[in-house]
UniProtKB/Swiss-Prot annotation:
Gene name per UniProt: imp3
UniProt protein name: U3 small nucleolar ribonucleoprotein protein imp3
Entry keyword S-adenosyl-L-methionine: no
Oligomeric form and interacting partners: Component of a heterotrimeric complex containing imp3, imp4 and mpp10.
Similarity comment: Belongs to the universal ribosomal protein uS4 family.
Span of domain S4 RNA-binding: 109-175
Length: 183
């Protein structure tokens, strides 16, 4: 490497290229992004902010008097909402929000992960590709965004689109292909 000029040395005086600080704080987000096939770090950061807001709301509710009717009403409302979204496994207690409402819980409700859970796809990356190509619908709506969060009530309505070649191939394999569907 060449010797740096005076103005370059002044600019890089506090930078050491040989012993840089190893930042191990991002290993968790890299693991979550890889496991759930999140392509953009901004999505992970949004999920992290949402989890922080859940925790903040739960903490503020816990500061109120335990017999306060406002606290009881909104605790039940928050627990029910998070359970219906699929983020919490049960609507039992507020401490579950601190322990179990995390980024992974939100990522488990993404459409590609639900497709793998329903055995529509073997891996999350393949499910993401199929969603982006428009092969999947939730209810009557065709979804092309892999970041779509599926609630517990909509989980039963995740199917292939009517025009999808995958649906036709599955019906042909199961001997349920109707001649009317070929039109």
């Amino acid at each position: 490497m060449r010797i740096l000029k005076h103005h370059e040395q002044k600019l890089l005086r506090k930078v050491d290229f040989l012993n840089y600080k190893n930042d191990d704080n991002n290993h968790r987000d890299v693991m979550v992004m890889r496991r759930y096939h999140i392509s953009k770090r901004e999505e992970y950061q949004k999920y992290n902010i949402i989890c922080g807001k859940f925790r903040q709301l739960a903490h503020r509710l816990s500061l109120l008097d335990p017999t306060d009717p406002f606290r009881l009403q909104y605790e039940n409302l928050l627990l029910e909402k998070l359970f219906d979204m699929g983020i919490l496994p049960s609507k039992s207690k507020m401490s579950d929000i601190e322990n179990k409402a995390n980024v992974s819980a939100i990522c488990r409700r993404r459409l590609p992960v639900i497709m793998c859970k329903l055995r529509m796809s073997q891996v999350v990356s393949e499910a993401t590709r199929l969603i982006e190509q428009g092969h999947v619908r939730v209810g009557p709506h065709v979804i092309t965004d892999p970041a779509y969060l599926v609630t517990r009530s909509l989980e039963d309505f995740v199917t292939w689109t009517d025009t999808s070649k995958i649906k036709r191939t599955i019906a042909k394999y199961n001997d349920k292909l109707d001649d009317y569907d070929l039109l």
